[in-house]
Amino acid sequence: MIQTESRLKVADNSGAKELLTIRVLGGSSRKFAGIGDIVVATVKSAAPGGAVKKGEVVKAVIVRTKSGAKRPDGSYIKFDENAAVLIRDDKTPRGTRIFGPVARELREGGYMKIVSLAPEVL
């Protein structure tokens, strides 16, 4: 589960490398975010010459979590890291490539562009 102050790896080529979560979107008292949820974050480290700069406030969708997600069939999916993809206001990714696998739950969340760019959907 991702909460305020959680650090996330960036799984796209937007130029950001690491994010710090500021807020979980979806209600004033919402504390945690899982796979497919949107967070507001700040860029803590960025690649030189990238589209985003250090200190910039961005929106991101969670694509991998260590705590994982429970599936309707009773199985769980867990990853080795917490990762997110930077998005625009219309839910399209800011980068043009996605690195690493993403969870199938993004398909139900309406992030078809991210799912189609990902090398593997688990």
From Swiss-Prot:
Recorded GO MF terms: large ribosomal subunit rRNA binding; structural constituent of ribosome
Pfam family, one: Ribosomal_L14
Secretion signal, residue range per the UniProt entry: none
Annotated InterPro entries: Ribosomal_uL14 (IPR000218), Ribosomal_uL14_bac-type (IPR005745), Ribosomal_uL14_CS (IPR019972), Ribosomal_uL14_sf (IPR036853)
Keywords carried by this UniProt record: Ribonucleoprotein, Ribosomal protein, RNA-binding, rRNA-binding
GO BP terms in the entry: translation
Protein family: Belongs to the universal ribosomal protein uL14 family.
Record's protein name: Large ribosomal subunit protein uL14
Organism in which the protein naturally occurs: Lactococcus lactis subsp. cremoris (strain MG1363)
